[in-house]
C-alpha cells in the first residue's frame, strides 16, 4: 500500500493489456494474400484435418488463419479478408478468414447460420 506522498510523486500505473490479435492493429479486418493453404491436426482430445492458410497481410504481418465451413476454393495467391478470433484446438491460429468475401466463396448449400459462412438465401421451390 503506497503512502499519499508516493502516489503524489508517481501516481497509479494502468495495467497494459496485450492484444489477442496484434496483426489487426486495432482494425476489424485486414486483406491479405494466401502464401500456403494446408490442413493441420488439432490438440489432444480432438481429431480432424482442419483447413488453415498462411496469409501475408497488407501491413506486412504473416499469420495463420482458419478456413471455416465445409469445403473451400482457396489456393496460393488467393486474396482473402482476415478477421480476428482464435481456434481453441489449433495452437498458433489466432485469425479467421471471412467466407464469401474477395476470392473465398461462401459455403455451398448452407441453410442455417448463412451469414457466418457467406451463403446466399436459397431460392424458393
From Swiss-Prot:
Where are the disulfide bridges? none
Q: Where is the signal peptide?
A: none
Spell out which residues are annotated as carrying 3-methylthioaspartic acid: 89
GO annotation, biological process: translation
Concerning InterPro entries, the annotation shows:
NA-bd_OB-fold (IPR012340), Ribosomal_uS12 (IPR006032), Ribosomal_uS12_bac (IPR005679)
Q: Which Gene3D superfamilies match?
A: Nucleic acid-binding proteins (2.40.50.140)
SUPFAM superfamilies the UniProt entry points to: Nucleic acid-binding proteins
One Pfam family name is Ribosom_S12_S23
Which keywords does this Swiss-Prot/TrEMBL entry list? Methylation, Ribonucleoprotein, Ribosomal protein, RNA-binding, rRNA-binding, tRNA-binding
Please give the GO cellular component terms listed in this UniProt entry. Answer: small ribosomal subunit
Biased segments, Basic residues type: 113-125
**Region of interest called Disordered, as start-end residue ranges on this chain:** 1-31, 105-125
Description of how the protein assembles with itself and partners: Part of the 30S ribosomal subunit. Contacts proteins S8 and S17. May interact with IF1 in the 30S initiation complex.
Q: Which NCBIfam families match?
A: rpsL_bact (TIGR00981)
State the family named in the UniProt similarity comment for this chain: Belongs to the universal ribosomal protein uS12 family.
Q: What is this protein's name?
A: Small ribosomal subunit protein uS12
Query: What gene name is listed for this protein?
Result: rpsL
Amino acid at each position: 500500500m503506497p503512502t499519499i506522498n508516493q502516489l503524489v510523486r508517481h501516481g497509479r500505473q494502468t495495467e497494459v493489456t496485450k492484444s489477442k490479435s496484434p496483426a489487426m492493429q486495432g482494425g476489424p479486418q485486414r486483406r491479405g494474400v494466401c502464401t500456403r493453404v494446408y490442413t493441420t491436426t488439432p490438440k489432444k482430445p480432438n481429431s480432424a484435418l482442419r483447413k488453415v492458410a498462411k496469409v501475408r497481410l497488407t501491413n506486412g504481418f504473416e499469420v495463420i488463419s482458419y478456413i471455416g465451413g465445409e469445403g473451400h476454393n482457396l489456393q496460393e495467391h488467393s486474396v482473402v479478408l482476415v478477421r480476428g478470433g482464435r481456434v481453441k484446438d489449433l495452437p498458433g491460429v489466432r485469425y479467421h478468414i471471412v467466407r464469401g468475401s474477395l476470392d473465398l466463396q461462401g459455403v455451398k448449400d448452407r441453410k442455417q447460420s448463412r451469414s457466418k459462412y457467406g451463403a446466399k438465401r436459397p431460392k424458393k421451390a
